[in-house]
Each structure stands twice: as structure tokens, then as C-alpha cells.
Amino acid sequence: MSTMRLLTLALLFSCSFARAACDPKIVNIGAVLSTRKHEQMFREAVNQANKRHGSWKIQLNATSVTHKPNAIQMALSVCEDLISSQVYAILVSHPPTPNDHFTPTPVSYTAGFYRIPVLGLTTRMSIYSDKSIHLSFLRTVPPYSHQSSVWFEMMRVYSWNHIILLVSDDHEGRAAQKRLETLLEERESKSKKRNYENLDQLSYDHKRGPKAEKVLQFDPGTKNVTALLMEARELEARVIILSASEDDAATVYRAAAMLNMTGSGYVWLVGEREISGNALRYAPDGIIGLQLINGKNESAHISDAVGVVAQAVHELLEKENITDPPRGCVGNTNIWKTGPLFKRVLMSSKYADGVTGRVEFNEDGDRKFANYSIMNLQNRKLVQVGIYNGTHVIPNDRKIIWPGGETEKPRGYQMSTRLKIVTIHQEPFVYVKPTLSDGTCKEEFTVNGDPVKKVICTGPNDTSPGSPRHTVPQCCYGFCIDLLIKLARTMNFTYEVHLVADGKFGTQERVNNSNKKEWNGMMGELLSGQADMIVAPLTINNERAQYIEFSKPFKYQGLTILVKKEIPRSTLDSFMQPFQSTLWLLVGLSVHVVAVMLYLLDRFSPFGRFKVNSEEEEEDALTLSSAMWFSWGVLLNSGIGEGAPRSFSARILGMVWAGFAMIIVASYTANLAAFLVLDRPEERITGINDPRLRNPSDKFIYATVKQSSVDIYFRRQVELSTMYRHMEKHNYESAAEAIQAVRDNKLHAFIWDSAVLEFEASQKCDLVTTGELFFRSGFGIGMRKDSPWKQNVSLSILKSHENGFMEDLDKTWVRYQECDSRSNAPATLTFENMAGVFMLVAGGIVAGIFLIFIEIAYKRHKDARRKQMQLAFAAVNVWRKNLQDRKSGRAEPDPKKKATFRAITSTLASSFKRRRSSKDTQYHPTDITGTLNLSDPSVSTVV
């Protein structure tokens, strides 16, 4: 008996313990719903979730309330009816009244304070995506701002690249604007990764994403948006995207109808609010709107939200030890520690079997991959004409009726026929001259005799840095202006031309030393909307092509180097330039060596003396002076009148010398013409790889233009970094300044576009281009991205190439060669070339005059010596005769003869005495009074 009792007690205890161990964990889920009917649906959805998961460990329990009339009552109800039940999550639907935005807010604030996750069911307002305000809010529907993804995809499908974004200046409008701009920027960043290498192809396309031409905002509740819509009407875009409340949308529709902006050519893309309620009454036919599929189906969202919570609860309880949620709000300020973890599990959930489709959340807790119906208002009724499946738009174009009753897709833009053209002063492509006093342009003619086509262009009268700038009307003409006139006539548009304000082509520069970069020059004006088109010698490069559209190149070119031409200067010794000084010395030495050899050969040869017969005396052999005269005469090809060598050996040498002289003279004559007439090739730059460029020094300065495509090219090329560092210190503000610096010898080399430099070299004969072209590219017309004119401009340029118009422009403006015509003229010698020869003749005359005086002086001196010797011989003879007479015993000499002898001896004695006293004085025989009387009979007799 006692044993039976013990067994019974043991069985009872074991059963009680087993029941305690088998009881599932109760997980309460709260809900704030619209009606009692939806509360019943909520309980059924919870029961279905329990059955679906079939877990004996977890049991979901439904706790719900309905909406309260105000926020305070709603917050109290959440605390008293839901949080007090220790709910793990709260589901909340949007209030049934469309203008009541407060009911989800108190639920989100109250539950968020304790970090209890809140799942919105039909709440679409974008404010709930802000996690700094709504900490624990998730939702199974996307916000209104996510409609921007559908608009963006429709723009891509229909190739609408020009849009106007019209938004209300509230949180909803700003959120839609921000999301759309983010999508546009993402597409833009992807397109920038393209490699634009084949710029020569017309098919190099820029399939960019759409871009908002303008964003127009208006205050919520405004009653007059006419001025705003008039501004939109002046733009090119005809695709208008509207994000506004129902009442604001109705205001916009009424104003648009009055401005005739709802007819043919326009496209209106709107969201769900803009085709609901009061807005639908004023919406124009043809408008395209969106409707979220199951967006207002509260029952479907209840089922999906419960399924997501149930899946997350099971996942959380199986992996983590969780704490219990807070019980009530009174006196409880502690947050639920497991709440943030549970929220992360919910956000990472992927519920594939939802009634509304696949349920996933993004980082803001908003629904991803929502499906939309694309609606078209036709005859005041909304007709579905396509769907958005979460990633792509699938339209049914045959069912769409566009504004104005059109069935063909509008192109989405209107082409303005009045274009603002920006250009830059760059000869020969654009000349800039002041206007006449009456405001007109001076009439001029081209080299072909045709009148020059000029247009009025406004711009600064001086673009040099630091100078005052005044915008004045000026006259522009040249290659690009003729091209602009041709394009305007072909494509039927008008234009107004202005010069770029800062005088630059365009490059990116930092703003206020920040990381932000902006374009300057013509690029900046085009991107900022100050210009519609750039018609100038703008080089096509990758950096610019990422931001603007380029047409087909109208001029192909590259980079080259401009240097100053070394003009040869004729010197007095220019006639000696054909031979080096060493050769001249050898020739001179040869002349004298040959002369000496001729003299010696003729002197020592037995046949060096010549006589006709034996009775005649032999002629003297060749003297040294005659040999010199012969040697020089043969060399200078002058006639030899006398003094020719007599011996056979000397004549052999003379013939060899004549051959030598012929070769020397012929070589000299040939080279003399080249040196006196033709330019000698100087040492120029060989190209970009020249050592003087690759190894820069302060002795050789080269540069380009600041903030130009050439500057960008050298900055981007790593292998040219050394050159760029040298150039950066010497770059000029404009090409004209740099070219003038080359002419003034302030700059040794200027690197720039070949078309410009070759033109300058052809017009300024002291300049020359050198080296081969490098960095080949082309000049193109610049337009904003996806400009409606791009294709037409490129086609027109292609036709101009085909029909020879571009060739004619080249001949008229670029290939006109002034210096070439001068260089092709026959070369003539000038006085400068032959001045040295005349100076040589003058030197010969001076030398001859100098030598004649020396000869005269020498002759007089020689004659005096000879006469002195004659007197001496006469005196000796007289003395000898007298001596003989004495020895023979003859009488005394005649007294007259004695007197004569005394006179002669006295004269000789005084002459020798004076000669010893002064060597430089010449003396002559004198008589007793100081003058020798040669007419004296006795003297003449003695002599």
C-alpha cells in the first residue's frame, strides 16, 4: 500500500516537471490597427504563423488596439495596453484619414524609447526613414521618396535626358529630390569610368544617365506657382517630374493648364499622391503616375509583417539568450537590452513568401523591391499602362496616351533656336578687333578676294591679368566664326557670341584651397549655363569629355614646338667661311712652298736657262719673285705674262699645282654660294625627346599656356613630370604672350597646338616650328552633356569635311603662307654678303698705296747709295791717276783737277760724317756749298 502511494506521488511529480519543461515561451506581438476587423485579421495571422512554424518552444500571442483620436491617448494606449504586456514588436498601420500624420508618430516615439521594434504597415511618409528621430521604425512599404527610382528608370527607358524637377519645399519634396539626384550622380560616376580613347569616331557615344536641367522648389500651400512654371517653360526640357501633396499638385496643374504646359510635347511624371483625391480632379490627360501595388491593402501587410516578426523571433531565440521586454511605462526608464539586436535581425530578414511579394529592408528599415503600377490618365480615368517590378520598368507603349492626345513618345525637350556662343581670341581661328565709331566692323577681304565675314561679339577689351576689364562690343572673325555661320545656316538657329571672361580655355581648379574643384574658362561658362555652345579651337581630351559633349573634330592637329629662327648674319670674313682656317693656312703655305720649289728646280736644272741659238746670251733662270707670282697667278686663275718655269721638272710641278688650284677654286666657288645665299641648318629642337627638354636647365626656358589642355597633358603624364615642373614656373597666360616672348628671346621654346604655331610661323618669318607632332588630337565644338544639338552639329561637320568646306577654311585662314612665298623667291646676294670682298679690295688698295711710298723711299735711298759709290769710285780713279802721274814723273796736276778732287773728297767726307750722325737722314752728293754739282765738267769727266 505504501509502495503504491510512493509510485503515485513520483508519477505526479514527474508529470508536473514535464509539463513545466514542455510549456512553450510566450512571445507577445502588439498592433495598432485601423478597425476591429483588422484586429481580427491580425489574430488570425498570428495563429497562422504559429501553425506554419509549428515550434513547441515558441508561442506567438496577439495583443492589439485601434487608433485613438489624438497623439496623447495613443501614447497612453501603447503603454497601458501593449508595453505592459511585454510585447516584442508593435505593428502600426496608417490612420484611415489621409491628412492624419500623427498616429504612427506617438507609437514610434513611445516604443522607440524602450527600443521596441515598430513595423509600419501602410505608412509612406519619408520622415520615418530618419533613424535619428524614429530609432526602431521599420515598414513593409517604401516611402514616397522611393518613387524617384521608378521615375529614374522610366527616364532611362524612354531616353529622356532633359528633365525639370518640380518639388515642394518640405521634407517629402526634399527627400524625393535628394534620392533622384543621388541616382543621377551614381549613374554619372559610372559613366566617368569609360575610356574615351577613340575620340575620332562619331559613334563615340556618351550614354549618360538623365540629368535635371533645373530644380524648382515652391513653398507648401502656395496658391500661385505661375512664375515658377514660366521659368520652367523657358528651359529646353519638356519632362516635368512633380513631387507635392494633393492640394499643391492641384495648384500646379491649374497653373500649367493656363500656361499651355499640358499639351503636346510635354511629359508629366508624378507619384501616387499627385493622382489621388483633389489632385486627380485637375490632373491633365496624358499624365503618368504611380500606384504602389497593395500599398493600401492593410490586411496583406498585416500578414507579411506577422510573418517577418515570427521568422525573426524564431531566429533570435534559437541563437541568442534574450531578455524580457519592459513591462509598462510607469516608473520604468530602462531600455530593452535585446531591442537593438532584435531590430537588426528584423532588418536582415528576407521573407520571400509575402502576400505583397518579397519582403526585405534597406539600411533605413524601408521596404525594398516594391512593385508599382504605372498609371496613365485617359479621359479622366486612370489606366494601367505598365509595371515596375522592383528593378525594371515594363511599359505597354501601345496603351499610353501622352499629353495632347499623342500616341508617339515625346522626345522630352525643345531645341532652343537662340544659342549663346562662347569663344576665345586665338588667331587664326578667332580674330578680335575693335568696332568702328559707328559700332560696325571694318570691311576686309580674304586672300581669295572674298569679303571677310564678321560678327559682333561682346567681351573684355583686355584679358591680361590685373588689368581692368570692360565688356564692350567687338568684331570677331576667322576660321571658327565662318564655321559658326555655316552651322547656323545649316541647322536654322540664331546666336549671340561673347568672349570668355577670364580668357582661358578651361581647366579644373580648387575652390578656396579646398578639395572641391570647379571648371574655369569656356568650360566653366558652358557647365554653369552662361553659354550653350563653345565654338573655338577647344582641344578634345578625356578630362573634358567626362563633363561636356564634343562634336566630331573639325580640325585634326597635335602639339609641336615653336622656336625663334636663327637668321644668319653676314660678317666681313663671310667669303672665307667655305674653308676652315686650317685649310686656309695650308693653302697659303702650299702657295709659298710650291713657289720656292719652282725657284729651286728651275735654278738648279741645267735647262733652266733658255737661248734661241748659240750666239745669243742665255736668259736668266726663274727668280724667286717670279716663282711667287707664277704660284699665285695659277691659284687665282690670273694670266701669267712672264716668269714661267723653263725646266721640265719645274713645269711638271707647275702642272700639278695648276690641277690642285683648279680643285681648290672649284670647291671654294661651290661652297661660297651655299654660305652666302643659303641658310645654314642650325641646331634646333628635335622634338619632345630632345635632351634640352628632357633635362631642363635655366639656360634653356620652355613653357606653354597656364590651365590649358597642353598644361593638363604634361601634368597627367608621369614620364613628363620633370618637364612639367620646369614649365610650371614659366607658363604664360595666353598663347599670344608666349609667342611674343619667343620673338623677344625671353623664351627659347613654346609648346602649343600645331595648327596655331604653324600659322604663326608662316606669318612671322623669324619663327619656325620644329620636331614631329605629338599628342595628336583634334578641335571640337563643346556642348553640355547630351545636348540636343550634338548629333546635328557632328553630322553637319562631317558633311562640311566631305564637300570641301573645311578644306576651303583651311586654305583661307590656316594655310596662308607669307614666309614661304618669300623663301621660294630666287636668292640674291646683297652687299652684306660681299662686304668682305670689297673690304679685301679696299685693303689691297691701302696696302698698295702704303707700299708705293715704301718703294719710293727705298728707291731714293738706293739711288743715293749708288751715286755715293760712283763718286767714291771716281775719287779713287782720280787719286790713282795722280799717283801714276807722280810715279811716271809727269808735271803737277792741273789746278782745276786738283780743285775738283778736293771737292769730291770733301763732299764724300761730309756725307759719311753726316751719315754716321743720323741713320734716318738721306744725303746726296753736294758741292762745296753743300750741293754736288754733277754738271761740273771735271766731275762728269771723272765719272
UniProtKB/Swiss-Prot annotation:
Bilayer disposition of the protein: Multi-pass membrane protein
Signal peptide: 1-20
GO cellular component labels: neuron projection; NMDA selective glutamate receptor complex; plasma membrane; postsynaptic density membrane; postsynaptic membrane; synapse
Domain of life according to the entry: Eukaryota
Residues at which glycine binds: 537, 539, 544, 709, 753
Subcellular location: Cell membrane; Postsynaptic cell membrane; Postsynaptic density membrane; Synaptic cell membrane
Keyword Membrane: yes
Extracellular topological intervals: 21-580, 669-833
Biological process (GO), any one: regulation of synaptic plasticity
Annotated transmembrane regions: 581-601, 652-668, 834-854
Post-translational modification: NMDA is probably regulated by C-terminal phosphorylation of an isoform of GRIN1 by PKC. Its phosphorylated state is influenced by the formation of the NMDAR-PPP2CB complex and the NMDAR channel activity.
PANTHER family: IONOTROPIC GLUTAMATE RECEPTOR
Record-stated family: Belongs to the glutamate-gated ion channel (TC 1.A.10.1) family. NR1/GRIN1 subfamily.
Subunit: Heterotetramer; the NMDAR subunits are modular and harbor tiered domains that function in concert to regulate opening and closing of the cation-selective ion channel pore. Forms heterotetrameric channels composed of two GluN1/zeta subunits (GRIN1), and two identical GluN2/epsilon subunits (GRIN2A, GRIN2B, GRIN2C or GRIN2D) or GluN3 subunits (GRIN3A or GRIN3B) (in vitro). Can also form heterotetrameric channels that contain at least two GluN1 subunits and at least two different GluN2 subunits (or a combination of one GluN2 and one GluN3 subunits) (in vitro).
Annotated function: Component of N-methyl-D-aspartate (NMDA) receptors (NMDARs) that function as heterotetrameric, ligand-gated cation channels with high calcium permeability and voltage-dependent block by Mg(2+). NMDARs participate in synaptic plasticity for learning and memory formation by contributing to the long-term potentiation (LTP). Channel activation requires binding of the neurotransmitter L-glutamate to the GluN2 subunit, glycine or D-serine binding to the GluN1 subunit, plus membrane depolarization to eliminate channel inhibition by Mg(2+).
Protein's name in the database: Glutamate receptor ionotropic, NMDA 1
